[in-house]
């Protein structure tokens, strides 16, 4: 069986419900519907990428985001960077055969031995540093000079900065390795990935055959 590549989306889904992760990332038998919110998020990320990297003015309807982009004008920003990491913690290509984990970082600002990570968010606020910490250990794998990591989400819909997180990439990586060990065990033994009931089951999960699903 083809090995699973770790990513924030996969790990977040697997931790919440392995069964949903199996249907979404292994069987790939769930319908994909690109919602208007998803389309908007893609347009916003594309516009902010051009604004931060090339100083291209933001399009109509995104003017309120200018203050967040302008705050980065005098900093050495790496924008929409695709990163890969091996199982041994070394940097590698995003699509390399030995990639264990991959991610795309909205904005990274390295300076001396520290790095600030900015992640644009167009959805509802959820101050969980997990995604930022995953970016941190992938950035470190590709730049061993960096030691300290800080991160912020920018909640664009609410027009505000999120809280500053002091990131712990080591603790996050150790946890993620344990999760991926569970994935490997499930794949090795060919058993069904278990369903974990959670707050999203009743109204939001697309795995309609699951006993916890409320959308049937």
Residue ranges of predicted features:
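Metal-dependent nuclease catalytic regions and adjoining charged, substrate-binding loops involved
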Residues: 5-6, 86-91, 97-98, 127, ...
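Nuclease catalytic cores
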Residues: 2-57, 80-81
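Short amphipathic alpha-helical segments and their helix-coil junctions
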Residues: 1-3, 19-32, 114-117, 180-191
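Short, charged/polar micro-motifs that form catalytic or ligand-binding hotspots
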Residues: 30, 34, 38, 122-126, ...
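Residues that form generic nucleotide/phosphate-binding pockets
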Residues: 13-14, 25-26, 47, 51, ...
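Catalytic cores of nuclease domains that cleave nucleic-acid phosphodiester backbones
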Residues: 43-117, 123-130, 141-156, 164-165
């Amino acid at each position: 069986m083809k090995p699973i590549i770790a990513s924030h989306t996969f790990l977040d889904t697997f931790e919440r419900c392995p069964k949903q992760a199996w249907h979404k990332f292994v069987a790939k038998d769930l319908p994909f519907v690109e919602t208007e919110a998803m389309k908007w998020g893609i347009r916003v990320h594309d516009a902010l990428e051009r604004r931060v990297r090339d100083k291209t003015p933001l399009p109509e309807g995104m003017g309120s985001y200018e203050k967040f982009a302008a705050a980065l004008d005098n900093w050495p920003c790496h924008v929409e960077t695709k990163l890969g990491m091996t199982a041994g913690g070394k940097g590698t290509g995003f699509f390399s055969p030995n990639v264990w984990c991959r991610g795309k970082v909205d904005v990274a600002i390295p300076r001396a031995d520290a790095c600030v990570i900015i992640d644009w968010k167009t959805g509802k606020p959820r101050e969980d540093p997990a995604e930022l910490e995953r970016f941190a250990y992938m950035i470190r794998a590709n730049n061993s000079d960096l030691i300290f990591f800080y991160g912020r989400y920018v909640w664009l819909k609410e027009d505000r900065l999120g809280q500053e997180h002091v990131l712990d990439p080591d603790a996050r990586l150790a946890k993620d390795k344990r999760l991926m060990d569970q994935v490997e065990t499930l794949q090795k033994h060919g058993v069904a990935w278990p369903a974990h009931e959670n707050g999203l089951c009743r109204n939001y999960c697309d795995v309609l055959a699951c006993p916890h699903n409320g959308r049937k």
